């Protein structure tokens, strides 16, 4: 029987990845520091080191992408909340503006009525035919309002 050196090579056992190192979970791999990772990688083959580093990089990128998605959703919700808040404020200001315009129109009408009345008084003695009924009513109402808010002094 002749011995063939080739069977010796066939008997060699190739090390599988991670065989001489404890298996790391994804959480452990991501959470360990670079120094800890380098200590763990000592003694591993170049392929194992490359595979573990690539796996760590992939897992970290997944984490970054997830946190970015969460941040983007949070910012979107905040912007939507601000948009609704500002829209409500615009509607409130539009109502106030409309109310003030109505008040301004009413005051303008009263002012014009008073100017008309003052012109008729300045032209001469007041006769019932010269003064319009609406002007008298407006003046009487205005006089009632002013007498209740500011006392009239006869000493002037």
From Swiss-Prot:
The keyword DNA-binding applies. It comes from Mus musculus (Mouse). The lineage of its organism: Eukaryota, Metazoa, Chordata, Craniata, Vertebrata. GO terms for cellular component: nucleoplasm; nucleus. PANTHER family: TRANSCRIPTION FACTOR MAF (PTHR10129), TRANSCRIPTION FACTOR MAFK (PTHR10129:SF26). Residues 51-76 are annotated as: Basic motif. Pfam families: bZIP_Maf. SMART domains: BRLZ (SM00338). It is found in: Nucleus. It comes from the Eukaryota. This is Transcription factor MafK. Keywords: DNA-binding, Isopeptide bond, Nucleus, Phosphoprotein, Repressor, Transcription, Transcription regulation, Ubl conjugation. InterPro entries: bZIP, bZIP_Maf, bZIP_sf, TF_DNA-bd_sf, Transcription_factor_Maf_fam. Highly expressed in heart, skeletal muscle and placenta. Also expressed in erythroid cells.
């Amino acid at each position: 029987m002749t011995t063939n050196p080739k069977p010796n090579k066939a008997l060699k056992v190739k090390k599988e990845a991670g065989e001489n190192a404890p298996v790391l979970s994804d959480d452990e791999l991501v959470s360990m520091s670079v120094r800890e990772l380098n200590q763990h990688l000592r003694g591993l083959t170049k392929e194992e080191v490359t595979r573990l580093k690539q796996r760590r990089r992939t897992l970290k990128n997944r984490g970054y992408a997830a946190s970015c998605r969460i941040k983007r959703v949070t910012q979107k919700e905040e912007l939507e909340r601000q948009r609704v808040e500002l829209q409500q404020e615009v509607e409130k200001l539009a109502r106030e503006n409309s109310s003030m315009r109505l008040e301004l129109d009413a005051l303008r009408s009263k002012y014009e009525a008073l100017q008309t009345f003052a012109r008729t008084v300045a032209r001469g003695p007041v006769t019932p035919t010269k003064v319009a009924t609406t002007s008298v009513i407006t003046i009487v109402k205005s006089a009632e309002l002013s007498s209740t808010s500011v006392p009239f002094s006869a000493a002037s």
